[in-house]
Amino acid sequence: MSTARFIKCVTVGDGAVGKTCMLISYTSNTFPTDYVPTVFDNFSANVVVDGSTVNLGLWDTAGQEDYNRLRPLSYRGADVFLLAFSLISKASYENIYKKWIPELRHYAHNVPVVLVGTKLDLRDDKQFLIDHPGATPISTSQGEELKKMIGAVTYIECSSKTQQNVKAVFDAAIKVALRPPKPKRKPCKRRTCAFL
């Protein structure tokens, strides 16, 4: 009997985008109603994907700037990153390429990224958008465009509250970690010799 392969999956993104809620929703099928910054403990579970058992280790990180020095310590040994932004926050969307991709490429440049748009249930919630005039909905096409811009392997939108696509996020992360994309090879420059 072979031992299960361990996959370290690290969630990254701005504070309050829903990283912890997504992890709690996935691991316990419940949605926390109160916002408590980064209270999720590291979690490990055996998961069967495509007939193979993997031990999935989930690591939560704090997005707040107070943790800029500590957060990268959790990146070591990561097999895949879940890079999250809120589908109702333009600032969190822009920080994907302004802050998070530069940080991930600096500390873990070869680790694949799954881009995740969270709070899908609120994007089309007219009452929420009326009550929160600062909320700016991000479209699916904007998410796909961002995926291409940052070189993410895939893009998934989810709602931790309704659990829509939450399992799909983690299934994608596992599949990406098991079969990471081949790095793009740079074309070789042909060297020419000139005999004089």
UniProtKB/Swiss-Prot annotation:
InterPro entries: P-loop_NTPase (IPR027417), Small_GTP-bd (IPR005225), Small_GTPase (IPR001806), Small_GTPase_Rho (IPR003578). Keywords: Cytoplasm, GTP-binding, Lipoprotein, Membrane, Methylation, Nucleotide-binding, Prenylation. Residues 194-196 form a propeptide. It is found in: Cytoplasm; Membrane. The modification Cysteine methyl ester is found at C193. GO terms for cellular component: cell projection; cytoplasmic vesicle; cytoskeleton; plasma membrane. GO terms for biological process: actin filament organization; cortical cytoskeleton organization; establishment or maintenance of cell polarity; plant-type secondary cell wall biogenesis; regulation of actin cytoskeleton organization; regulation of cell shape; secondary cell wall biogenesis involved in seed trichome differentiation; signal transduction. GTP binds at residues 13-20, 60-64, 118-121. A motif (Effector region) lies at residues 35-43. One of its GO terms (molecular function) is protein kinase binding. It is a peripheral membrane protein. A lipid is attached at C193 (S-geranylgeranyl cysteine). Its main location: cytoplasm. It comes from the Eukaryota. SMART domains: RAB (SM00175), RAS (SM00173), RHO (SM00174). Pfam families: Ras. CDD domains: Rop_like. Belongs to the small GTPase superfamily. Rho family. Could participate in a signal transduction pathway that controls cytoskeletal organization. Inactive GDP-bound Rho GTPases reside in the cytosol, are found in a complex with Rho GDP-dissociation inhibitors (Rho GDIs), and are released from the GDI protein in order to translocate to membranes upon activation. This is Rac-like GTP-binding protein RAC13. It comes from Gossypium hirsutum (Upland cotton).
